[in-house]
């Protein structure tokens, strides 16, 4: 998987979403 600002943002939002909920 290539790391790009877009994928990084999605991954960050995904981890935050799981952490918050």
From Swiss-Prot:
Keywords: Antenna complex, Bile pigment, Chromophore, Electron transport, Membrane, Photosynthesis, Phycobilisome, Thylakoid, Transport
PTM text: Contains one covalently linked bilin chromophore.
Membrane topology: Peripheral membrane protein
Signal sequence interval, chain numbering: none
GO biological process, one term: photosynthesis
Disulfide bonds: none
GO CC list: phycobilisome; plasma membrane-derived thylakoid membrane
Keyword Membrane annotated: yes
Major subcellular site: membrane
Keyword Cell membrane on entry: no
Subunit structure and binding partners: Heterodimer of an alpha and a beta subunit, which further assembles into trimers and the trimers into hexamers.
Function text: Light-harvesting photosynthetic bile pigment-protein from the phycobiliprotein complex (phycobilisome, PBS). Phycocyanin is the major phycobiliprotein in the PBS rod.
Sequence similarity: Belongs to the phycobiliprotein family.
Protein name: C-phycocyanin alpha subunit
Species per Swiss-Prot/TrEMBL record: Anabaena sp. (strain L31)
């Amino acid at each position: 998987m290539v790391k790009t600002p877009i994928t990084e943002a999605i991954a960050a939002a995904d981890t935050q979403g799981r952490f918050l909920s």
